[in-house]
Amino acid sequence: MFSVLSYGRLVARAVLGGLSQTDPRAGGGGGGGGGSSGDYGLVTAGCGFGKDFRKGLLKKGACYGDDACFVARHRSADVLGVADGVGGWRDYGVDPSQFSGTLMRTCERLVKEGRFVPSNPVGILTTSYCELLQNKVPLLGSSTACIVVLDRSSHRLHTANLGDSGFLVVRGGEVVHRSDEQQHYFNTPFQLSIAPPEAEGVVLSDSPDAADSTSFDVQLGDIILTATDGLFDNMPDYMILQELKKLKNSNYESIQRTARSIAEQAHELAYDPNYMSPFAQFACDNGLNVRGGKPDDITVLLSIVAEYTD
């Protein structure tokens, strides 16, 4: 009988072989160059807090606690993503941030190398996950993931969301698109996993193909907020929209201030024992007597759709 890892590597080789094709516009290296008149791009800023922020435990790079994120620019598309490492692995001596961080860094590298199709964000997630499965030294862990791709020329946003991270698209002060949260049961989101052989059949593991995928047109000035559940569990839509009203233009500095304001407010609410958070409301709906915010890692990527410039 194959172990989980042995079987995973065989699947990874087969999948990677089938994903070798790329969009012709995405070939030939990353970075800028060749933007056509009328192309769209994303101006993106991020902010976040690790759950242990009060203890001064911050990680290097684009990681906030067990969360990770990336923002990558290619001539054919702007791509960004967030991932939330499953903290339960810490009980088994595994650093949950290693899985989520490596997953996001692999996604970023694929985009910069042009090894992706803008209309297929699930493909980015699948190829990245398969590369993790192929590691000679197993990288154990689990993570949710959300990938957002703006195709410059078609002005379409393509998304893939697995688990309870997610995105909002705001236009004219209203949410016009949003991701669907995926849960097996309360507080147990869909997740990508790599488990040791002895844990076969015990650790939850979903396929990248299980990600909820959407595609839709966007307009200049649309606001896209991509975040881990640490935000959405602590701030309802109306609070997020109130903060977004402060965003008056597409200057990076303005976006950065707003992203920080949103992340800071979510972080403060997470430690308020009297606050009826979205997470507490969801818990009550599931028969649990819970009140207060949910202390968690928080990652926020805030983007505005603008005219593309190299």
Swiss-Prot record:
GO terms for cellular component: mitochondrial matrix; mitochondrial outer membrane; mitochondrion. GO terms for molecular function: metal ion binding; protein serine/threonine phosphatase activity; protein-macromolecule adaptor activity. It catalyses: O-phospho-L-seryl-[protein] + H2O = L-seryl-[protein] + phosphate; O-phospho-L-threonyl-[protein] + H2O = L-threonyl-[protein] + phosphate. Mn(2+) 2 binds at residues 84, 229. The keyword Chloroplast does not apply. Mn(2+) 1 binds at residues 84-85. InterPro entries: PPM-type-like_dom_sf (IPR036457), PPM-type_phosphatase-like_dom (IPR001932), PPTC7 (IPR039123). Binds 2 magnesium or manganese ions per subunit. Residues 1-74 form a transit peptide. Residues 75-305 form the PPM-type phosphatase domain. It is found in: Mitochondrion matrix. SUPFAM superfamilies: PP2C-like. SMART domains: PP2C_SIG (SM00331), PP2Cc (SM00332). Keywords: Hydrolase, Magnesium, Manganese, Metal-binding, Mitochondrion, Protein phosphatase, Transit peptide. Its EC number is 3.1.3.16. Its cofactor is Mg(2+); Mn(2+). GO terms for biological process: negative regulation of mitophagy; positive regulation of ubiquinone biosynthetic process. PANTHER family: PROTEIN PHOSPHATASE 2C (PTHR12320), PROTEIN PHOSPHATASE PTC7 HOMOLOG (PTHR12320:SF1). Protein phosphatase that plays an essential role in mitochondrial metabolism and biogenesis. Positively regulates biosynthesis of the ubiquinone, coenzyme Q. Dephosphorylates the ubiquinone biosynthesis protein COQ7 which is likely to lead to its activation. Serves as a crucial sensor for mitophagy, though the underlying mechanism remains ambiguous. May dephosphorylate BNIP3 and NIX and thereby directly regulates mitophagy receptor function and stability. Belongs to the PP2C family. Interacts with FBXL4, BNIP3 and NIX; these interactions are important for ubiquitination and degradation of BNIP3 and NIX. This is Protein phosphatase PTC7 homolog. It comes from Mus musculus. The lineage of its organism: Eukaryota, Metazoa, Chordata, Craniata, Vertebrata.
